[in-house]
């Protein structure tokens, strides 16, 4: 029966929309709920395309009705998210063909259906051929340090005593009378909770800890995501307030300069970064203006490029180091503006700009750190964009010292390779360091202090500092302490313990080989991703896929596939059960549509069990 339905849907897709009647809200809900194949997802897009002919509001109304009826989220969450993202979906489905590359990619995002299309062949053009040079050896001079932190997600309206176990996607506000202080069984403490974003008290403690443990830091890299996760409530005003308040807090507390980047949550609607030339009332210019103004204290006139498209290149004073901050939202799969009839190879010409900056750095014999929000190898990265960046990184691997990202909320690393069919210590070409988060939704709050060679800017060690929420005195004030040193932890696995030796790409590849043969070492690494909060084990396919992800700074090789018809249950938000993290890795609307589909699958499973 499923096969016959899929064939019928495929035939329907070829009929076009010219004579298509307006689909009813019930029809749209039924199609979303029953989607279990790529063909059926295309049918959903086909119906949305037909609805979009009657205006954006027709799409908004149908999706909102479906969300509420299915119980995918509370009514206010359904209305808030879909009112913001629904018009973008309407515009997208109006402008793309179904089926097409763009529509199938959209299906992987909205309903976790369809296989990700293969990367389109496209060679990046470089001004000069790659010279015969390699990474410089450590200078042996006295090391220096800097700080890397990410995903602060400060909730300016966090309410002490409000419920930390609410019905919303994120808690610790008085959404209902039963959530108010004194009316609930899980009151939020003054310094945060795993089901909530960061209160101001935690943010202030965080910056003070950086000053305490890294008083001589030359600078800090902040890899983005300032606003809280209440995506159904955000607007330009609230996001602007959040960005300005957080960067002001950094400026007033930290003596070190902070070099920032744009996260997906810095936009309103969330994830929404239209490209240049898009004729639409929704524009990214306001957020580029806000962040460039916030960054100007530390990067001065270089903030002008940030004002244009959220990226900049900055030479750190009195050093040979250039920091290049990328806007990874331009190849982020939950940015619904990327799905065009003719999907761009280089949105806003950012990759062309990056090549020019790296060529200038190579010519001047500068060292470079590349930073951005989303790691290019994760499942959230569009494969084409990730491939283009990987080409650039491998061309300039002797100039780039390391790369830095956030977004996942978990402490990890990724490796780039010059030959993806021969992964070895000899072909490992670049290391990406992925920072843990301040927000405690995926583990204990944490930041990293990196020890570096002052000439080559190669990474000599990475030390993580954290404040476990499970400490009995945590709510009296976070107890910050050293959590782990990369060289102390992993150096002994591969025979590299010399403090002056660099943690090269070859070193990190050898660590992944040690993970394969030493399961205790791997399980300890897996636990450290959440700073010890998630005590589950990762074996079999989980372990294989985790190591595959580490070795895949280019996303097409990360071994991940869409999670089709996965279970979704609000009960998993209860205290102690919300371990998955990666809250940044989902569009609010996509999560709603997938919840509708998975809830229907759960009902079918329960019914089948009853019939047995």
Region locations from a protein language model:
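Fungal secretory targeting signals
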Residues: 1-20
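Metal-dependent phosphoesterase/phosphodiesterase active-site architecture
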Residues: 20-140, 144-158, 162-211, 219, ...
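Active-site neighborhood of phospho(di)ester-bond hydrolases with catalytic His/Asp-centered motifs
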Residues: 148-150, 190, 218-225, 257-264, ...
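Active-site environment of divalent metal-dependent phosphoester hydrolases
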Residues: 156, 228-231, 260-271, 332-334, ...
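Core catalytic region of metal-dependent phosphoesterases/phosphodiesterases
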Residues: 188-190, 195-280, 284-287
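Short acidic, glycine-rich surface-loop motifs adjacent to enzyme active sites
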Residues: 222-230, 358-378
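Well-ordered, non-membrane alpha-helical segments in soluble/globular domains
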Residues: 238-247, 347-354, 384-389
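Active-site neighborhood of glycoside hydrolase catalytic domains
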Residues: 357, 362, 386-394
């Amino acid at each position: 029966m499923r096969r016959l339905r899929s064939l019928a849907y495929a035939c329907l897709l070829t009929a076009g929309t010219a004579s298509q009647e307006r689909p009813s809200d019930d029809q749209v809900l039924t199609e979303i709920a029953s989607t279990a194949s790529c063909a059926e997802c295309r049918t959903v897009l086909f119906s949305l395309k037909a609805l979009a002919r009657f205006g954006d509001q027709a799409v908004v109304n149908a999706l909102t009705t479906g969300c509420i009826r299915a119980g995918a989220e509370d009514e206010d969450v359904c209305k808030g998210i879909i009112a913001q993202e629904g018009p973008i979906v309407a515009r997208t489905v109006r402008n793309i063909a179904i089926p097409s590359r763009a529509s199938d990619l959209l299906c992987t995002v909205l309903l976790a259906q369809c296989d990700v299309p293969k990367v389109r062949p496209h060679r990046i053009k470089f001004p000069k051929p790659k010279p015969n040079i390699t990474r410089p050896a450590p200078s042996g001079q006295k090391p220096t340090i800097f700080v890397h932190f990410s995903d602060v997600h400060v909730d300016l309206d966090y309410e002490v005593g409000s419920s930390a176990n609410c019905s919303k996607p994120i808690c610790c506000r008085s959404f209902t009378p039963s959530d108010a202080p004194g009316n609930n069984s899980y009151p939020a403490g003054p310094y945060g909770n795993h089901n909530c974003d960061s209160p101001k008290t935690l943010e202030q403690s965080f910056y003070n800890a950086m000053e305490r443990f890294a008083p001589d830091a030359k600078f800090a890299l902040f890899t983005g995501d300032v606003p809280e996760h209440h995506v159904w409530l955000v607007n330009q005003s609230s996001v602007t307030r959040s960005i300005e308040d957080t960067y002001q807090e950094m400026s007033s507390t930290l003596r070190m300069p902070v070099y920032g980047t744009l996260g997906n949550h810095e936009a309103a609607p969330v994830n929404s970064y239209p490209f240049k030339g898009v004729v639409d009332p929704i524009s990214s210019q306001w957020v580029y203006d806000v962040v460039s103004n916030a960054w100007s204290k530390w990067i001065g006139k270089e903030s002008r490029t940030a004002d244009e498209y959220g990226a900049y290149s900055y030479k750190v004073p009195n050093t040979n180091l250039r920091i290049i901050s990328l806007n990874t939202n331009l190849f982020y799969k939950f940015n619904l503006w990327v799905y065009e009839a003719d999907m761009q190879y280089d949105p806003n010409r950012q990759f062309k700009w990056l090549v020019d900056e790296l060529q200038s750095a190579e010519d001047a014999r500068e060292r470079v750190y590349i930073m951005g929000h989303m790691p290019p190898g994760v499942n959230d990265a569009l494969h084409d964009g990730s491939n283009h960046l990987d080409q650039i990184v491998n061309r300039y691997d002797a100039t780039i010292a390391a790369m830095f990202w956030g977004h996942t909320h978990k402490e990890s690393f990724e490796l780039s390779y010059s030959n993806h069919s021969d992964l070895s210590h000899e072909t490992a070409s670049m290391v990406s360091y992925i920072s843990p988060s301040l927000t405690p939704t995926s583990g204990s709050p944490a930041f990293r202090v990196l020890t570096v060679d002052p000439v080559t800017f190669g990474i000599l060690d990475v030390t993580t500092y954290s404040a476990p929420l499970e400490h009995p005195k945590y709510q009296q004030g976070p107890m910050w302490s050293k959590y782990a040193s990369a060289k102390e932890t992993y150096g002994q696995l591969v025979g590299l313990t010399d403090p002056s030796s660099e943690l090269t790409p070859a070193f990190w590849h050898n660590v992944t080989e040690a993970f394969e043969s030493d399961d205790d070492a791997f399980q300890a690494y897996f636990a450290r991703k959440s700073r010890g909060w998630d005590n589950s084990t990762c074996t079999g396919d989980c372990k294989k896929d985790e190591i595959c992800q580490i070795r895949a700074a280019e996303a097409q090789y990360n071994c991940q596939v869409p999670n089709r018809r996965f279970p979704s249950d609000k009960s998993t938000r209860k205290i102690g059960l919300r371990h998955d993290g990666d809250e940044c890795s989902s569009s609010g609307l996509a999560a709603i549509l997938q919840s509708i589909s998975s809830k229907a699958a759960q009902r079918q499973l329960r019914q089948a069990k009853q019939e047995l």
